[in-house]
C-alpha cells in the first residue's frame, strides 16, 4: 500500500472514532456501571528532594447518573528511584531519614459530565487516603540524620516513619473523554492536596490516560416484566 493510501486510511479511521456519523444520536450513558483502568505518571516531592515523576497504574469504578457520577478507585505508583524524606520527632526535635519506593492512593468522589456528547469534558472532586508503602527508617549512618545510636532510637525512628506514612487528602480532577458505544477513552489530570507531617511534601499530581467499559445498567428497569 502506498504511503498516501495508508495516510488516507488512517485519517478515515480517526474520523470514524472521533466524530459520530451525521445524524447519529449520542448513546444514553445514564445510570450505568463502568469499570476502568488507567496508566500514567505520578509527580511528587519530599522535604529531601524535588519533584520526581514515576509510573502509576490504577483501576476504578464509575456509576453514572444523568450528568454526574460516583467515582471510586485506587492507584499504585512505583518509584524507579528510592525516595528519601526526613521525619522529625515533635517531642525531642530529633530528625530521622526514611526511604520508600511505592505510594498507594484510594479515593472516592463525584464527577460531572455536563455535555453528554461523543467528545466531552469532565471534572470532579473528592477525598482519598494516600499511603506510602513500607516506609523504612534509615539507620545506616550514611548521613547525620541516618543514625540510630540505640535500639530504642531505631524503634522510635521506625514508629515516626509509620506515623508519617498515611494521610487523608482532598483531590480535584479534570479531563476529556471520547465515547464509542459502551467504551470510553479518556485523558485526565488530578491534583491531591498537601498534608501535614506526611512523607510527601506539598501537593501531588497525576497525569494519566485510560479506558472504561459499561457492563450494564445501574438502575433496575421497573417497566420490565418479571
Where are these regions (language model features)?
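Short glycine/proline- and aromatic-enriched beta-strand/turn motifs that initiate or cap beta-hairpins
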Residues: 19, 23-66, 212, 216-218, ...
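Outer-envelope beta-barrel architecture signal
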Residues: 27-35, 66-70, 117-123, 181-183, ...
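Residues that define the transmembrane beta-barrel architecture of outer-membrane proteins
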Residues: 31-33, 51-57, 100-106, 119, ...
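Membrane-embedded beta-strand positions of outer-membrane beta-barrel proteins
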Residues: 35-39, 72-74, 108, 121-125, ...
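Sequence/structural signature of outer-membrane beta-barrel proteins
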Residues: 39-47, 79-86, 129-134, 190-198, ...
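Extracellular loop and loop/strand-boundary signature of outer-membrane beta-barrel proteins
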Residues: 43-47, 91-98, 155-162, 194-199
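Outer-membrane beta-barrel "beta-signal"
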Residues: 178, 203-226
Amino acid at each position: 500500500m502506498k504511503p498516501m493510501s495508508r495516510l488516507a486510511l488512517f485519517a478515515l479511521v480517526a474520523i470514524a472514532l472521533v466524530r459520530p456519523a451525521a445524524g447519529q444520536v449520542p448513546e444514553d450513558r445514564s445510570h450505568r456501571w463502568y469499570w476502568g483502568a488507567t496508566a500514567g505518571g505520578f509527580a511528587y516531592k519530599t522535604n529531601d528532594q524535588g519533584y520526581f515523576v514515576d509510573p502509576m497504574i490504577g483501576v476504578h469504578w464509575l456509576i453514572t447518573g444523568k450528568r454526574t457520577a460516583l467515582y471510586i478507585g485506587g492507584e499504585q505508583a512505583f518509584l524507579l528511584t528510592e525516595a528519601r524524606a526526613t521525619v522529625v520527632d515533635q517531642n525531642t526535635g530529633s530528625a530521622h531519614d526514611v526511604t520508600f519506593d511505592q505510594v498507594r492512593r484510594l479515593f472516592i468522589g463525584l464527577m460531572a459530565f455536563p455535555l453528554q456528547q461523543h467528545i466531552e469534558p469532565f471534572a470532579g472532586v473528592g477525598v482519598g487516603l494516600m499511603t506510602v508503602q513500607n516506609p523504612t527508617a534509615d539507620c545506616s549512618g550514611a548521613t547525620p540524620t541516618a543514625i540510630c545510636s540505640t535500639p530504642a532510637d531505631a524503634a522510635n525512628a521506625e514508629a515516626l516513619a509509620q506515623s508519617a506514612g498515611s494521610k487523608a487528602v482532598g483531590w480535584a480532577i479534570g479531563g476529556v473523554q471520547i465515547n464509542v458505544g459502551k467504551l470510553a477513552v479518556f485523558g485526565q489530570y488530578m491534583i491531591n492536596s498537601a498534608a501535614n507531617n506526611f512523607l510527601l511534601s506539598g501537593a501531588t499530581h497525576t497525569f494519566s490516560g485510560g479506558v472504561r467499559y459499561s457492563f450494564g445498567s445501574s438502575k433496575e428497569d421497573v417497566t420490565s416484566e418479571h
